[in-house]
């Protein structure tokens, strides 16, 4: 289903419903999102849940960035809605909020019939997560959360720095992401495809971007930028991107 720049890339029930067919069994939702960082509000999640009830569908909610939000109380899980127990499959993990990328540790809450089948699949593929990784996960959940708060404060500063810097570059427009660590600026004014723009920035500015088209046709005209780096690196990247964009503006 499409996400629209005009509403900050938030999911809309009407866009999802337009694509439901008699063969549809599952809706996949993601909030906060990769690549946009957008967060879908509770009222819109309720509308999506109502769709699932109307068409008797499961909902798979990927909430890997649920702890990575920039406004207190902003995140809302669709699994917290009434009657969600038998319809929502919720997944989460440790790689983002606890900086445990590569540990391959996560969790799922699902209706019993789904959970039982997932257990069968797990047992015949990887058996289980190694014991020391499980202990690390317990320490992450039960331990002092101050490092997580400090990390998010740093991400907030980096987000603000990057988005403000992008919006100061003529020809680029960028929404302020509500979560995760991605920005998804609109670069369509330069007359290049997102892949051409990303290739040019890598070649001329030594800045690595991901073409929005990698995320589907709706991403054309956008690029994804990650601010999981130092403020000094972000400033340097902005200066280089701005220089190339100024050169492009002279040609458009």
Protein language model regions, located:
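PLP-dependent class I/II
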Residues: 1-252
């Amino acid at each position: 289903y499409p996400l629209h720049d005009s509403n900050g890339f938030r999911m809309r029930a009407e866009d999802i419903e337009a694509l439901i067919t008699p063969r549809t069994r599952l809706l996949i939702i993601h909030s906060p999102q990769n690549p946009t960082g957008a967060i879908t509000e509770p009222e819109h999640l309720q509308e999506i849940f109502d769709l699932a009830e109307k068409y008797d569908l499961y909902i798979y909610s990927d909430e890997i960035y649920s702890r990575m939000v920039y406004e207190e109380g902003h995140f809302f899980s669709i699994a917290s809605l009434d009657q969600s127990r038998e319809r929502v499959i919720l997944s989460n993990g440790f790689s983002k909020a606890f900086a445990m990328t590569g540990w391959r540790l996560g969790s799922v809450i699902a209706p019993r019939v789904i959970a039982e089948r997932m257990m069968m699949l797990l047992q015949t593929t990887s058996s289980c997560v190694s014991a020391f990784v499980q202990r690390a996960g317990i320490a992450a959940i039960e331990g002092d959360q101050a490092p997580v708060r400090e990390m998010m404060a740093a991400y907030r500063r980096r987000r603000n720095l990057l988005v403000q810097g992008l919006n100061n570059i003529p020809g680029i427009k960028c929404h302020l992401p509500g979560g995760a660590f991605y920005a998804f600026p609109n670069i369509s004014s330069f007359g290049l495809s997102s892949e051409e723009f990303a290739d040019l920035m890598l070649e001329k500015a030594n800045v690595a971007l991901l073409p929005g088209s990698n995320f589907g046709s709706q991403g054309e005209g956008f690029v994804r930028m990650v601010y999981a780096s130092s403020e000094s690196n972000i400033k340097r990247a902005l200066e280089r991107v701005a220089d190339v964009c100024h050169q492009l503006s002279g040609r458009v």
